[in-house]
Design a protein with these regions (language model features):
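Long, low-complexity, intrinsically disordered polar/charged segments
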Residues: 22-35, 54, 71-83, 100, ...
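Conserved donor-binding loop and adjoining core beta-sheet/short helix segment
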Residues: 46-87
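Active-site rim helix/loop that mediates acceptor-substrate recognition in acyltransferases
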Residues: 30-51
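Terminal substrate-recognition subdomain of acyl/acetyltransferases
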Residues: 1-13, 114-139
Length: 139
């Protein structure tokens, strides 16, 4: 059975935030400290990112997206995505499949996201384009 996927409007965020925040924090744990859950909340509430949830009886997936208009191309970026149950890769695959039609309606020509290398198996249609290299400094 396919679960429901919904892109929430900003006035709906507070109704589901307590269920979504712990899921999103799982993704934040792998984001190298660039932002925290309060930053994510404000980016969504201020309209910079959209919050998507997948649910049946409860929320099983939460993710954020943003449409970015570059000078030559419009893309959908997925900054954060996580499932309540770490085994929910089927939900992740389903979310991408369901979002694709909406993305095209918005004029996006591509979808991009950062992921661990193992996700390549889940998304064989995506091309591995770059390797992110990072060096932390003592401050």
């Amino acid at each position: 059975m396919q679960k429901n996927l919904v892109k929430l409007e900003t006035d709906q965020i507070d109704k589901v935030w307590n269920a979504c925040a712990p899921i999103l924090e799982k993704a934040l744990d792998r984001c190298e400290g660039y932002h925290d859950i309060d930053d994510v909340y404000h980016r969504i509430k201020d309209g910079y990112e959209d919050l998507w949830v997948m649910f049946d009886d409860e929320i099983t997936l939460a993710g954020t997206t943003r449409i970015v208009h570059y000078p030559k191309k419009t893309v959908l970026e997925i900054p954060l995505l996580a499932t309540k149950d770490n085994g929910g890769l089927g939900d992740v695959r389903s979310m991408f499949d369901q979002v694709e039609g909406w993305v095209k309606e918005q004029g996006a020509e591509a979808t991009v996201f950062f992921a661990r290398i193992g996700w390549k198996k889940l998304f064989p249609e995506f091309k591995l384009k770059h390797t992110l290299m990072m060096k932390d400094y003592e401050v």
